[in-house]
Structures are given as structure tokens and as C-alpha cells.
Amino acid sequence: MTRDVRGIANFVLDSADRQSIGISNLGLNKIIYFLHSAFLHHFGEPLVSAKIEAWDYGPVFREVYHQFKRFGRSEITDRANKLNVFSGNYDRVNYEFDFETELFLNQQCNSLLRIPAGKLVDLSHMEDGAWHRARFQDGRVNPGVEITNELILTENPRGARH
């Protein structure tokens, strides 16, 4: 079962708040990417169904980027919302996990939140990593190209790179 990437964003933001850690849009997108990668490697299924794009500063989930772009480089102080088609209001995107998933995501997220956004960008840009191979496939720059789950599965999970 895949989850709404905006709900995962809210999970990360809530986790950061509990630890009094500020997080920018750049850092948030990278953390979600590494959570998705770790989940995919560990459980053999994607965490989210959202398309991951290879932007200049690493993997980006367009839905997350646009939801929080108003914060620029500043700390995000809001949560992701989606339109409720029945009420016409925007409601917070919630998240709920089974015990095993919650334990896994908490452990991964707590580790990732301690890494500065710039270092997360560097980790996402590893040569022969999924971002690098998507971005520079066929020997040319391909901005915004999709980073597929198949590409992610061919790279080492983040923890194995340290």
C-alpha cells in the first residue's frame, strides 16, 4: 500500500517538531526521498506513489515542493493540505501506519533529521546513484526526469553509503 506523499511530509514535519528541528523544503524533499528509498529496499514496496523528479538540488516530489514553496529556504511552519471535494475546504493530510512501518519510519526519520540539508543533497547526488543516473542518462542533462523505483533499487540504501 502506497501513501500520499503529503502525509509523509506531515509525518516528517511532526517528527522534526518533536525534536525541535527546523526543516526547509529542500531538506524535507530529501528526507522523504531517503525514507522512500529505505522503505523500498527494506519492504520491497514503495512508500509513496508520487513521481520523484531529478531536479538540480536532488530528488523532488513536485506535490511537496509546491505545497511548501511559499517558505522559500526558511523553516516550514505549516502542514500539507488537500482539497476536500465534499466540503470545499482544505484539510490536513493525515498519516497512519501499522506498527512495523511506524517503527521503521521513526528510526529512519530520526536519523535523517540529524543530517543537514546540504549533506542530504550531497548524498542524493552520489555518482551512479539513482538521481545521478536519471539526471545524466544517455550522457546528457535531463532536468526533471523521473527517478523510478527500479533505479532506486539498483543503488545502495543510504545507510550503506556512510
What residue spans do the PLM features occupy?
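Domain-edge interaction signal
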Residues: 1-162
